[in-house]
Amino acid sequence: MMKIREFKNSIEFKNDGQLSLFFLGTGGAFSKKYFQNNALIIKGNSHILIDCGTLCPLAFSFFNSDITQVRNFLLTHNHADHIGGMEEIALVNMYGTKQVPNILITDEFKKILWNESLKGGLKIKGENSAKPTMSFDDYFHQIKPKKIKKSPRPFYEAKIGDINLKIFRTKHIFTDKNNWKNSYYSIGVLIDNKIIYTGDSQADKELIEWLTSEFNIECIFHDCQFGHNAVHTDYEELLKILTPDLRKKTYLCHYSDNADQQKDRVMQDGFAGCVTRGVYYDCE
């Protein structure tokens, strides 16, 4: 079960050892009310930020904290609401903290992230330098996850301090509905073998059934849109793929600005609720 704990003063990057999630934002790409769906995982002395969108540095400031405190990142895909803050992360660390942040990332996505998103703003250092042309490795330290064999989809594992993370491919944007292999690169995260964080995903019964059959899942944070959406999980579809028992464990996130109008229905339909930004979700 998840216990909700209030935010006080500034974001905590350490705790007494329980697994906690703090959502900087809970909104979709175009939300003007909820910031973007980016979440900090904390456990003991360890932390990692899942996604860092264009508004993420501002969100940290909103919660009286500095994003340069984040030393570990995991990015689910290269849409701006998930990676748009990473150019700032690269530059404020290079010229400010003089530290190199860690990114948990596969070789496949490392190439996509650099060549298709970050390279345009970071390739040229812009000063007299013995190395005027920069690369991903000049700004970030790659933590490469280990591939897990015998899984129905690419499945990787790594540890960030005390936090165990497994990443899996999701169906977000694709050209063939029946084949995730043709889909745009996007991942979800299994945290400490008990929390599913879907990232951006369409309704994916096969994925949920696989994870819940293999692991003792205590909580699911699921992408959800209220109204038809071609690249996210529609609420009506989610009702169809989640059993009543799973709904009790599921919090909805990455929603649009009309979510307030749906919260009563969400509870009536048996979900744990809509995620609230700015509180701690502690795994008991």
Feature locations, PLM:
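Cap/insert and terminal regions of metallo-dependent hydrolase folds
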Residues: 201-284
